[in-house]
């Protein structure tokens, strides 16, 4: 690749004595795996910048699945994430690593990701709003076209006074059943607008995204979620991403 692309490191691991194997999220090519030769060496100027949450410009070469990183330059300092915001950022990175197709462009999602990190870095409260908005944006970019505004059974507009039950690959059906898969019309209208004016709609958004993401994640638990539970003090309700 001759030109530069904007990118973030999603995950990195040592490779040989001096190199790094990196998963990148790039603006034009989506998720890429690159080998950063010599990046762990004493004289490498890449050590400090090949870290998660640092906006980068990168170039690579190669024709196989694993490319060779040729250049990387930080666009700015790493976004300052700490505490629950740091674990939330790691959760978002793990989601992208798990669900994105390799070398498939998600240019709109790249900016949703950047906005999510900026929201986390600028927040002094809960990460919940930023995470739920990003999850819904990611599902939309994956082609998970859930219609929150119409009943899948009748085609009628969702009523804020009724209850609807989610059915995978179909959508929301009007129902008298109230269980884990049930949502009020008011909650669905909030999800459609990606707005969470109160704790009830925020909890509903979290419940829906966990249901919707489950087929993508399979039975393998998210490591970042377990780390959050281990190292961040929990209130009575589950605060993990």
UniProtKB/Swiss-Prot annotation:
Segment forming the signal sequence: none
GO biological process, one term: DNA recombination
UniProt KW DNA damage keyword: yes
Keyword Nucleus assigned: no
Alphabetical UniProt keywords: DNA damage, DNA recombination, DNA repair
Gene3D superfamilies recorded: Nucleic acid-binding proteins, Recombination protein O, C-terminal domain
SUPFAM superfamilies with a match to the protein in the record: ArfGap/RecO-like zinc finger (SSF57863), Nucleic acid-binding proteins (SSF50249)
Any Gene Ontology CC annotation: bacterial nucleoid
InterPro entries linked: ARFGAP/RecO (IPR037278), DNA_rep/recomb_RecO_N (IPR022572), NA-bd_OB-fold (IPR012340), RecO (IPR003717), RecO_C (IPR042242)
Main function: Involved in DNA repair and RecF pathway recombination.
PANTHER family for this protein: DNA REPAIR PROTEIN RECO
Protein name: DNA repair protein RecO
Lineage of source species: Bacteria, Pseudomonadati, Pseudomonadota, Gammaproteobacteria, Enterobacterales
């Amino acid at each position: 690749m001759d030109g530069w692309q904007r990118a973030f490191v999603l995950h990195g691991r040592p490779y040989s004595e001096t190199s790094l194997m990196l998963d990148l999220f790039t603006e034009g090519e989506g998720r890429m795996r690159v080998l950063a030769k010599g990046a762990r060496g004493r004289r490498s100027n890449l050590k400090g910048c090949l870290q998660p949450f640092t906006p980068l410009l990168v170039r690579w070469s190669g024709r196989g699945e694993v490319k060779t990183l040729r250049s990387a330059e930080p666009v700015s300092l790493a976004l300052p994430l700490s505490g629950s915001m740091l674990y939330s950022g790691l959760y978002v990175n793990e989601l992208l690593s798990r669900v994105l197709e390799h070398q498939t462009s998600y240019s709109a999602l790249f900016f949703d990701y950047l906005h999510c990190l900026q929201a986390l870095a600028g927040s002094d409260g809960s990460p919940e709003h930023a995470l739920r908005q990003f999850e819904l944006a990611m599902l939309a970019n994956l082609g998970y076209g859930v219609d929150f505004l119409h009943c899948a059974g009748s085609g009628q507009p969702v009523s804020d006074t009724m209850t609807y039950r989610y059915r995978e690959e179909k959508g929301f059906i009007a129902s008298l059943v109230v269980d884990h898969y049930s949502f009020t019309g008011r909650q669905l209208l909030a999800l459609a607008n990606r707005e969470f004016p109160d704790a009830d709609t925020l909890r509903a958004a979290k419940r829906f995204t966990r249901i919707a993401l489950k087929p993508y994640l399979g039975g393998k638990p998210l490591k970042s979620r377990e780390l959050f539970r281990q190292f961040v003090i929990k209130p009575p309700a589950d605060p993990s991403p």
